[in-house]
């Protein structure tokens, strides 16, 4: 009879990077192309994705929030689920993987988010955290009368600072009397409180966004850059580390990449070229138009990178295209960038992509050696 024992590598030998999946809460995932897989977002699809991710030893799953899409032939992101309710359902059908929902802070009062997060903390057994976004796409909020005016672009992190203050009050103590320019709490209560310290994540790439993350977030997401240039985001991670060091805190960077992999480099490259050839130009034009409406935040924002025509077919997230071995090597290069704690992955086809990652890519990654801790014992 055989059994398995867990063998941990000595700390000095560990080279660890966390892996997450950016679940497709909107139709067609992250490829704005008529040649890409076309599908609607459903709970069953996302359940299958996150359960596969858990089986393949992914560390976390995150969903965005999107309230209006880009249109075009593919109706890109015109069809979306809601983040908190989706992740509550996924928390109930998983057991180990960390679960993160996104709060569109212009639409939800912080006291309500605090209570919803505490509820999902209970459902998940302490596996839940919150991603906070300020909102950049004006039509998402104008359609429901919630856009506060274009001056919001320049003061959104002041708003978010007050927002997170209320959240921390309620999660940490169960009570808040916070008084600010945007929020007024009068003996506001939340109970039960989370059983674990609630993790807050943000996705700031502008100086203001990074300054906020340095002060208030536990992790900061950033875009990877380019195609098969895995370390090109290093200056962004360095800026985040410098901001966190200045604040006296440790805030690691988590980097967004799309993986397009196959058995050979040529096969993977052929898929990538096929997707680019089918780019939905109408939807991409709408994205470009929206990105130009924020004239107050500078050129270093996430949305400016998303709309760059260089690789807009997948909103210019870093893209790793190649054989399983090539992608594994590139992800190890990502892990070697100072300040990097993890990656958030999307796939051209999530169901087959996650299995291929777990079976063919992850076993080749040095930064995932800690998973190979089982050995047969006679």
From Swiss-Prot:
<feature type="binding site">
    <location>
        <begin position="156"/>
        <end position="157"/>
    </location>
    <ligand>
        <name>FMN</name>
    </ligand>
</feature>
<feature type="binding site">
    <location>
        <position position="140"/>
    </location>
    <ligand>
        <name>FMN</name>
    </ligand>
</feature>
<keyword id="KW-0288">FMN</keyword>
<dbReference type="GO" id="GO:0006212">
    <property type="term" value="P:uracil catabolic process"/>
</dbReference>
<keyword id="KW-0285">Flavoprotein</keyword>
<dbReference type="InterPro" id="IPR050172">
    <property type="entry name" value="SsuD_RutA_monooxygenase"/>
</dbReference>
<feature type="binding site">
    <location>
        <position position="206"/>
    </location>
    <ligand>
        <name>FMN</name>
    </ligand>
</feature>
<keyword id="KW-0560">Oxidoreductase</keyword>
<keyword id="KW-0503">Monooxygenase</keyword>
<feature type="binding site">
    <location>
        <begin position="65"/>
        <end position="66"/>
    </location>
    <ligand>
        <name>FMN</name>
    </ligand>
</feature>
<dbReference type="GO" id="GO:0008726">
    <property type="term" value="F:alkanesulfonate monooxygenase activity"/>
</dbReference>
<protein>
    <recommendedName>
        <fullName>Pyrimidine monooxygenase RutA</fullName>
        <ecNumber>1.14.99.46</ecNumber>
    </recommendedName>
</protein>
<comment type="function">
    <text>The FMN-N(5)-oxide reacts spontaneously with NADH to produce FMN. Requires the flavin reductase RutF to regenerate FMN in vivo.</text>
</comment>
<dbReference type="Pfam" id="PF00296">
    <property type="entry name" value="Bac_luciferase"/>
</dbReference>
<dbReference type="InterPro" id="IPR019914">
    <property type="entry name" value="Pyrimidine_monooxygenase_RutA"/>
</dbReference>
<dbReference type="InterPro" id="IPR036661">
    <property type="entry name" value="Luciferase-like_sf"/>
</dbReference>
<comment type="similarity">
    <text>Belongs to the NtaA/SnaA/DszA monooxygenase family. RutA subfamily.</text>
</comment>
<feature type="binding site">
    <location>
        <position position="131"/>
    </location>
    <ligand>
        <name>FMN</name>
    </ligand>
</feature>
<dbReference type="GO" id="GO:0052614">
    <property type="term" value="F:uracil oxygenase activity"/>
</dbReference>
<dbReference type="GO" id="GO:0019740">
    <property type="term" value="P:nitrogen utilization"/>
</dbReference>
<keyword id="KW-0521">NADP</keyword>
<dbReference type="InterPro" id="IPR011251">
    <property type="entry name" value="Luciferase-like_dom"/>
</dbReference>
<dbReference type="GO" id="GO:0046306">
    <property type="term" value="P:alkanesulfonate catabolic process"/>
</dbReference>
């Amino acid at each position: 009879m055989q059994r398995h024992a867990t063998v941990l590598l000595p700390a000095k030998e560990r080279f660890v990077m966390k892996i997450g999946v950016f679940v497709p809460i909107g139709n067609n995932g992250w490829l704005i192309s008529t040649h890409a897989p076309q599908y609607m977002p459903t709970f069953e699809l996302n359940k299958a994705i996150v359960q596969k991710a858990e089986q393949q030893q992914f560390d976390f799953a995150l969903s965005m929030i999107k309230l209006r899409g880009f249109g075009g032939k593919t109706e890109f992101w015109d069809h979306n689920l809601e983040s908190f309710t989706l992740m509550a359902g996924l928390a109930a059908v998983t057991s180990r993987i960390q679960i993160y929902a996104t709060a569109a802070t212009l639409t939800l009062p912080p006291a309500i988010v605090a209570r919803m997060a505490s509820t999902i903390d209970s459902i998940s057994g302490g596996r839940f955290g919150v991603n906070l976004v300020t909102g950049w796409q004006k039509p998402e909020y104008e359609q429901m009368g919630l856009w506060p005016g274009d001056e919001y672009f320049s003061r959104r992190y002041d708003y978010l600072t007050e927002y997170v203050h209320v959240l921390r009050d309620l999660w940490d103590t169960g009570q808040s009397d916070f008084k600010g320019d945007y929020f007024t709490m009068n003996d506001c209560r939340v109970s039960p409180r989370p059983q674990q310290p609630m993790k807050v994540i943000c996705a700031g790439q502008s100086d203001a966004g990074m300054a906020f993350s340095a002060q208030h977030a536990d992790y900061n997401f950033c875009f990877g850059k380019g195609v098969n240039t895995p370390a090109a985001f290093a200056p962004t991670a360095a800026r985040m580390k410098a901001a966190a060091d200045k604040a006296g805190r440790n805030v690691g960077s988590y980097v967004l990449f799309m993986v397009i992999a196959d058995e050979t480099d040529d096969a993977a490259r052929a898929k990538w070229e096929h997707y680019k050839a089918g780019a939905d130009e109408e939807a991409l034009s709408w994205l470009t138009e929206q990105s130009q409406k924020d004239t107050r935040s500078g050129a270093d924002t996430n949305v400016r990178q998303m709309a760059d025509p260089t690789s807009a077919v997948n909103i210019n997230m870093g893209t790793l295209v190649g054989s399983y071995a090539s992608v594994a090597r590139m992800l190890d290069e990502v892990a070697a960038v100072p300040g990097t704690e993890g990656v958030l992955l999307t796939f051209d086809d999530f169901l087959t992509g996650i299995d291929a990652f777990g079976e063919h890519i992850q076993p080749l990654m040095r930064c995932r050696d800690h998973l190979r801790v089982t050995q047969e014992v006679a």
